[in-house]
Regions:
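Conserved N-terminal subdomain of the carbohydrate kinase-like
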Residues: 39-44, 49, 64-147, 309-323
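Phosphate- and divalent-cation-binding pockets in alpha/beta enzyme and binding domains
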Residues: 80-83, 106, 211-212, 232-234, ...
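Hydrophobic beta-strand scaffold residues
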Residues: 69, 95, 172-173, 224
Length: 325
């Protein structure tokens, strides 16, 4: 079975590798219309608030799966932002955030078949290089990033985090994020950025993979995990060789697909940190994603317990806070 890059010799009962995940605390506003929307009219709907955000979602799932997780990023300098950041500690996540601006809100419109359409405001990830510190990333074994963090506004902070973790001997995983980014940046420039980041593992969905590699020949610095929704997930080697294809277990009902990709990444990363092989890591991601799509909201209940066996984290420490600006 194909192996994932190793964090070091596993020690029974020893400290766990530390996974740092960058992102922005987000308040999701989930809307499930109870009848078809009518232009210019009003529609009775189920509406509720839920924590969200790519990075927090991945961090939450990985922690529930037994990983030692640190969230490094941004929260609004308001009551909601502080509460969202504090909520991550409920599942044992170390929090190292800069609080500034207002909390980012995302409107999530859920259709009858569970598919979601999102609209987000402009209060998203915008960390400068001086807001990302070496202390926040000390002892990190794996850094998980999203491609849009390398946008002009946030590029300096993301590159600094990458350099700090690489200098400490850590590895990197990268999520393509969404098809709109490829269309905005351009295919060749997007591929160049992937090469520059050089992630050990790259996550993409089917649409993103087709946009990046239209000939079907996958090329990347490391492993590439391509998700196909309810269809099997395929993992490719850097030279395009197909390593494994893993079936996605059926769920009783798809309620809301919000956060499915984040949950898959979180489960995968936690399994990787446990020393699992590629097949086992994908299976772990499928399990967590399946649980998320069976409910409303992008984060599982804090009582969820996955396959991980939480032991002492490799690097102990209190929750960090970079201060506000």
């Amino acid at each position: 079975m194909a192996a994932l890059p190793r964090f070091g010799p596993p020690v029974a009962g020893g400290p766990r590798p530390v996974i740092a995940i960058m992102g922005c605390m987000v308040q999701d506003i989930v809307v499930k219309p109870l009848s078809p929307l009518v232009a210019g009219g009003s529609t009775m709907s189920q509406i509720f608030f839920a924590p969200g955000g790519f990075g927090p979602n991945v961090a939450w799932t990985a922690a529930l799966e037994g990983a030692a997780v640190r969230f490094v990023g941004q929260a609004g300098a308001d009551t909601v932002g502080g509460a969202l950041a504090e909520s991550l500690t409920e599942v044992g996540i170390e929090v190292a955030v800069t609080q500034k601006g207002t909390t980012c809100c995302v409107l999530v419109l859920v259709s009858d078949d569970g598919q979601r359409t999102m609209a987000y405001d402009t209060s998203s990830f915008s960390l400068r290089a001086d807001e990302v510190t070496a202390d926040q990333l000390a002892g990190v074994d794996l850094l998980h990033l999203y491609e849009n963090m390398f946008d002009d506004i946030t590029a300096a902070g993301a590159w600094k985090a990458l350099r700090v973790v690489r200098a400490g001997g850590g590895m990197v995983s990268l999520d393509v994020g969404n098809i709109a980014r490829i269309q905005l940046v351009g295919r060749e420039q997007f591929l160049d950025r992937i090469d520059q980041v050089a992630p050990e593992v790259l996550f993409a969905n089917e649409e993103e993979a087709e946009a990046l590699w239209p000939t079907g020949r996958v090329r990347a610095p490391g492993l590439v995990v391509v998700k196909h929704g309810a269809w099997p997930t395929t993992v490719y080697a850097s030279d395009g060789e197909e390593l494994v294809t893993v079936r996605v277990p059926a769920v009783d009902a798809v309620v809301d697909t919000t956060g499915a990709g984040d949950a898959m990444a979180g489960g995968f990363l936690a399994a990787w940190a446990r020393g699992c092989d590629v097949n086992e890591a994908v299976e772990a991601g499928h399990r967590t994603a399946g649980a998320v799509v069976s409910q409303y909201g992008a984060q599982l209940p804090p009582t969820w317990r996955g396959a991980g066996d939480p032991g002492p984290p490799r690097h102990q420490g209190d929750a960090l806070n970079a201060g506000s600006s």
